[in-house]
């Protein structure tokens, strides 16, 4: 289980208040089953998974607030996977 720090997350977001809001919204999405995690779950709580996603740059304030932006990120990820498998 990789440790995530606030400093890791603040490199991706403007301030700690935005971090709290984004992490809370993302954790709620994960907990309710509305969204799939973008990192390995590793038996962590949804809040930890949300912070790990933010620290890795996989989740942004825009993608949490705007489901269309989140879907376009999924499409980009799918395109990369398709290219890597040569299909």
UniProtKB/Swiss-Prot annotation:
Annotated GO CC locations: DNA-directed RNA polymerase complex
GO process terms (BP): DNA-templated transcription
Keywords of the record: DNA-directed RNA polymerase, Nucleotidyltransferase, Transcription, Transferase
EC number assigned by the record: 2.7.7.6
Catalytic activity line of the entry: RNA(n) + a ribonucleoside 5'-triphosphate = RNA(n+1) + diphosphate
Family listed: Belongs to the RNA polymerase subunit omega family.
Stated role: Promotes RNA polymerase assembly. Latches the N- and C-terminal regions of the beta' subunit thereby facilitating its interaction with the beta and alpha subunits.
Alphabetical list of PANTHER family matching this protein: DNA-DIRECTED RNA POLYMERASE SUBUNIT OMEGA
Assembly, per entry: The RNAP catalytic core consists of 2 alpha, 1 beta, 1 beta' and 1 omega subunit. When a sigma factor is associated with the core the holoenzyme is formed, which can initiate transcription.
Protein name: DNA-directed RNA polymerase subunit omega
Gene: rpoZ
